[in-house]
Curated annotation (Swiss-Prot):
The gene is pyrC. One of its GO terms (molecular function) is zinc ion binding. Belongs to the metallo-dependent hydrolases superfamily. DHOase family. Class II DHOase subfamily. Keywords: Hydrolase, Metal-binding, Pyrimidine biosynthesis, Zinc. GO terms for biological process: 'de novo' pyrimidine nucleobase biosynthetic process; 'de novo' UMP biosynthetic process. It comes from Shewanella baltica (strain OS185). Pathway: Pyrimidine metabolism; UMP biosynthesis via de novo pathway; (S)-dihydroorotate from bicarbonate: step 3/3. The modification N6-carboxylysine is found at residue 99. This is Dihydroorotase. Zn(2+) 1 binds at residues 13, 15, 99, 247. Binds 2 Zn(2+) ions per subunit.
């Protein structure tokens, strides 16, 4: 039986939601992840230090006994985020980054940034104090095709931010295109990217060919196979610029299976197991540990986890649903088999 032991991984991009759903999302991600960067797009969003810290307390209250799981908090940037707020957040010791959501780009992004110039003072403060800048890299102009929104964002917006703030550490999150891979690869060492398991394992054919499969619908949307292969090559390349970020984003079953379904795929039930499948598919299991356990903390200037987990190649059946507060979520690979499991 094939087994691999790796340093305990972290998730550098996850949605834990809030309220009754929190106990279920925290249960799943804390099984073997040491830390997770927790997205702030709540209702209302975590736009200030106090809101982010009270959210931290709610998450910690749901961590199962015996788990050392630690949430790493993120400030939600708005047009009005001040340099002083950035300094307060950094001084808290628990908020490690601030997040750009272009207004309307994804779930609960209506409070997001309408003009990048509005956050330049905040970005200057972040560069000064060493706070990371996390980016949902899509334009929101309705005239831009949804499959092109990441590429256009990189060309028109991100390239300018990188030039204007050369000392700012930037994470282009959940990248989905060869364009993003190339940009991050060629940029300075201050630019990195997260890649999801579902963008490594799937492309838009899985979502659209032979019937619409709404649980694959996420933002940024799945792209064509050539982009999927570029992501796999980047993740398995050994480059320190790419690391694990699930973007696990639960929605109730009836919110996904609807005439106008929500964007987001749930992978926290089997995150590292799905990544193991992806890396095995390109004969790169030897590169999984760096991607999952080293590159993220190294980029964030945080210590690597000290303990390990062991993955065993032992297929198991994924339940059709998992509990999500007072409803259910349909996970990726629901009712099917995953080849790996954590011992």
């Amino acid at each position: 039986m094939t087994t691999i032991t790796i340093t305990r991984p972290d998730d550098w991009h996850i949605h834990l939601r809030d309220g009754a759903q929190l106990k279920d999302t925290v249960r799943d991600i804390s099984r073997y992840m040491g830390r997770a960067i927790v997205m702030p797009n709540l209702v209302p969003p975590a736009i200030d230090t106090e809101t982010a810290l009270t959210y931290y307390d709610r998450i910690k209250a749901q961590v199962p006994a015996g788990s050392q799981f630690e949430p790493l908090m993120v400030l939600y940037l708005t047009d009005k985020t001040s340099p002083d707020e950035i300094r307060r957040a950094k001084a808290s010791g628990k908020i490690v980054a601030a997040k750009l959501y272009p207004a309307g780009a994804t779930t609960n992004s209506d409070s997001g940034v309408t003009d990048l110039k509005n956050i330049y003072p905040a970005l200057e403060a972040m560069q000064e104090v060493g706070m990371l800048f996390l980016v949902h890299g899509e334009v929101t102009d309705s005239s831009i095709d949804i499959f092109d929104r990441e590429r256009v964002f990189i060309e028109n917006i991100l390239s300018k931010i990188v030039a204007d703030f050369p000392e700012l550490k930037i994470v282009l999150e959940h990248i989905t295109t060869k364009d993003a891979v190339d940009f991050v690869t060629q940029a300075s060492d201050n630019v990195a990217a997260t890649i999801t398991a579902h963008h490594l394992l799937y492309n838009r054919n899985h979502m659209l060919a032979g019937g619409i499969r709404p649980h694959f619908y996420c933002l940024p949307i799945l792209k064509r196979n050539t982009h999927q292969q570029a992501l796999l090559a980047a993740a398995a390349s050994g480059s320190k610029k790419f690391f694990l970020g699930t973007d696990s984003a639960p929605h109730a079953k009836d919110k996904k299976e609807a005439a106008c379904g929500c964007a987001g795929s749930y992978t926290a039930h089997a995150a590292i197991e799905l990544y193991a499948e992806a890396f095995e598919s390109v004969n790169a299991l030897d590169k999984l540990e760096a991607f999952a356990s080293f590159n993220g903390p190294d980029f964030y200037n945080l210590p690597r986890n000290a303990d390990t987990i062991t993955l065993v190649k032992k297929p198991w059946d994924v339940p059709a649903t998992y509990p999500l507060g007072d409803t259910n979520v349909v996970p990726i690979r629901a009712g099917e088999v995953i080849d790996w499991q954590v011992e």
